[in-house]
């Protein structure tokens, strides 16, 4: 075969399942991926399925994407489509490590076997089975969200569409994200009900990557976090 598609044998093919066929996918530096790759990931995130040679393959019911992103001012990055950003439940700014954490990193570099120990420290071990995860997710259905709190969530999301400094506000997916995430936060806090404080605590992580500021406000140095904080201060909180 001379590697031309029209003369190569085409009767011997097998699906080679790549890294996307998993329950938890870590996509490192997602904004360095070209548009075609981002489009394929978007389908996986939206449909929990991928299409290869016109055949659709289902992914794990627990398929979840964790992604890191480089600051946009770095060279070699691509803007993420708004539709793709909207598929992410939360966006969390990691920041730099504190002094104690960075000191531990420095200590690991001491000794002749430092490279090996650093690699060993990065080994990931399973901490929960998929069946246990399914059970935990089921418990979230028992977390109560009062009608007043649901109304507060809707008011916050719709408020982003009415704020002068915001060009594009959050869509209905943000409302869904609030319901999911606040229930999880309540469970982690040992409560069986969601409070308005849960909504406030998750407002920036849920809304931050879904909002687009007007250019004139960006030039003035206004940040999305500041706009969200002002919005929370303006909206009446249910008792």
Each model region followed by its residue ranges:
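Short, small-residue-biased leader/transition segments that mark boundaries at the very start
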Residues: 1-9
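Conserved AAA+ ATPase small/helical "lid" subdomain
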Residues: 118-175
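Walker B catalytic acidic pair
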Residues: 28-29, 40
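Canonical AAA+ ATPase core
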Residues: 6, 33-37, 45-128, 133-143, ...
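C-terminal engagement/docking regions of AAA+ P-loop ATPases
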Residues: 159-239
């Amino acid at each position: 075969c001379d590697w031309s598609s029209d003369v190569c044998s085409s009767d011997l093919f097998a699906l080679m399942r790549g890294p996307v066929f998993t329950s938890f996918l870590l996509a490192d530096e997602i904004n360095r991926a070209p548009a075609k790759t981002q489009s394929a990931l978007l389908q996986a995130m939206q449909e929990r399925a991928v299409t290869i040679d016109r055949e659709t393959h289902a992914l794990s019911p627990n398929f979840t994407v964790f992604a890191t992103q480089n600051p946009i001012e770095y060279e070699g990055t691509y803007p993420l489509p708004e539709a793709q950003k909207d598929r992410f439940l939360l966006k969390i700014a990691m920041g730099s490590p504190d002094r104690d954490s960075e000191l531990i990193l420095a200590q690991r570099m001491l000794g002749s076997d430092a490279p090996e120990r650093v690699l060993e420290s990065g080994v990931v071990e399973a901490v929960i089975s998929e069946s246990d995860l399914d059970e935990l997710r089921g418990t979230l259905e028992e977390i109560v969200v009062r009608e007043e709190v649901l109304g507060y969530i809707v008011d916050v999301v719709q408020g982003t569409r009415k704020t002068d400094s915001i060009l594009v506000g959050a869509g209905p997916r943000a409302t869904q994200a609030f319901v999911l995430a606040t229930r999880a936060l309540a469970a982690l806090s040992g409560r069986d009900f969601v409070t308005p404080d849960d909504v406030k605590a998750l407002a920036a992580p849920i809304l931050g990557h879904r909002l687009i500021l007007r250019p004139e406000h960006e030039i003035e140095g206004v940040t999305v976090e500041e706009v969200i904080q002002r919005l929370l201060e303006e909206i009446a909180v249910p008792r």
